């Protein structure tokens, strides 16, 4: 899950998906 740099929301979503 790699979100684009500067996208806090995308990063949070990506991290949550990675945690799953």
UniProtKB/Swiss-Prot annotation:
Q: Which UniProt keywords apply?
A: Copper, Oxygen transport, Secreted, Transport
Identify the main location: secreted
Show the segment(s) annotated as Disordered: 1-20
- What is the reported tissue distribution? Hemolymph.
- An example Gene Ontology cellular component term from the record? extracellular region
Protein location: Secreted, Extracellular space
Q: Name one GO molecular function term.
A: oxygen carrier activity
**Family per record:** Belongs to the tyrosinase family. Hemocyanin subfamily.
- Main role? Hemocyanins are copper-containing oxygen carriers occurring freely dissolved in the hemolymph of many mollusks and arthropods.
Give the multimer and partner information: Composed of 3 major subunits (IB, II and III) and 1 minor subunit (IA) which form homohexamers and heterohexamers. May also form larger structures.
Task: Provide the protein name.
Answer: Hemocyanin subunit Ia
Species this protein is from = Panulirus japonicus (Japanese spiny lobster)
